[in-house]
């Protein structure tokens, strides 16, 4: 622990807590501070001016990161017959119907994302109390209830990131690994922030994006210059 404390202390000393960093400088600093013995995840935290307790102020969605997350995602698919074959061909790790539901009810959760064809929702619906709290319940708004299972599996495997605002109005997500190039991380971050911008709810009043910070798994947070970041998104 002393070793970890010394490393973190050194990393903190490289960050100006009163400064709002340009994206490129923030990414460079985060990468240089990611000195753990594993490939740290680069994480973004966005404080939004919303109250998610109100239905018209909820922020939730899915975004495809152009350079993936660097994480191996295990995908389970509820499908039958030809759709099950399509899911397997697309790279799904687990495919099933009632048999898959039985495994989940028995406590088997060896997957990170769950997809279902619409006709399977009668089976999946019964698992709501199990899958819901774990953030695994298929949802048509997120593209995880769909007849296009192959496309959904490829998206999940290729860097699709689900986001949802917490009760405090904060959205967290991993946007890549410290081993990614600076350009790859910047592209992923811009894609994520753009998705949050597009997901601005009708009930949001005043300043929408209040604070954005970037960090690695074991590193200190770095505040981003929001006006410059938003201006860099284009379109």
From Swiss-Prot:
What are the alphabetically sorted keywords of the record? Answer: Repressor, Ribonucleoprotein, Ribosomal protein, RNA-binding, rRNA-binding, Translation regulation, tRNA-binding
Q: Name one Pfam family in it.
A: Ribosomal_L1
Q: List the transmembrane segments.
A: none
Q: Which PROSITE patterns does this chain map to?
A: RIBOSOMAL_L1
Q: Does the keyword Ribosomal protein apply?
A: yes
Q: Which GO terms describe its biological process?
A: regulation of translation; translation
Is Transcription regulation there in the keyword field? no
* SUPFAM superfamilies registered for this protein in UniProt: Ribosomal protein L1
CC terms in the record's Gene Ontology section: cytosolic large ribosomal subunit
A GO term, aspect molecular function: tRNA binding
Listed Gene3D superfamilies:
3.30.190.20, 3.40.50.790
**Top-level lineage group:** Bacteria
Q: Partners and quaternary state?
A: Part of the 50S ribosomal subunit.
Name listed for the protein in its UniProt record: Large ribosomal subunit protein uL1
Q: Which organism is it from?
A: Rhodospirillum centenum (strain ATCC 51521 / SW)
């Amino acid at each position: 622990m002393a070793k970890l404390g010394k490393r973190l202390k050194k990393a903190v000393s490289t960050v100006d807590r009163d400064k709002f960093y340009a994206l490129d400088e923030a990414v460079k600093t985060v990468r240089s501070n990611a000195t753990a013995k594993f490939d740290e995840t680069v994480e973004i935290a966005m404080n939004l001016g919303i109250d998610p307790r109100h239905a018209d102020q909820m922020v939730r969605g899915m975004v495809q990161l152009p350079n993936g997350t660097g994480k191996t995602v295990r995908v389970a698919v509820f499908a039958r017959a030809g759709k099950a074959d399509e899911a397997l061909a697309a790279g799904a790790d687990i495919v099933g119907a009632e048999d898959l539901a039985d495994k989940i009810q028995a406590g088997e959760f060896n997957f990170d994302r769950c997809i279902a064809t619409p006709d399977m929702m009668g089976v999946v619906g019964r698992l709501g109390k199990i899958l819901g709290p774990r953030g695994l319940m298929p949802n048509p708004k997120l593209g995880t209830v769909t007849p296009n299972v192959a496309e959904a599996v490829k998206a999940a495997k290729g860097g699709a990131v689900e986001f949802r605002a917490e009760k405090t109005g904060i959205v967290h997500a991993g946007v890549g690994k410290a081993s990614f190039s600076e350009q790859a991380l910047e592209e992923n971050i811009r894609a994520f922030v753009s998705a949050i911008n597009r997901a601005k709810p009708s009930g949001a009043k005043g300043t929408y994006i209040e604070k954005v910070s970037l960090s690695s798994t074991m590193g200190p947070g770095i505040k981003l210059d929001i006006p410059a970041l938003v201006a860099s998104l284009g379109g």
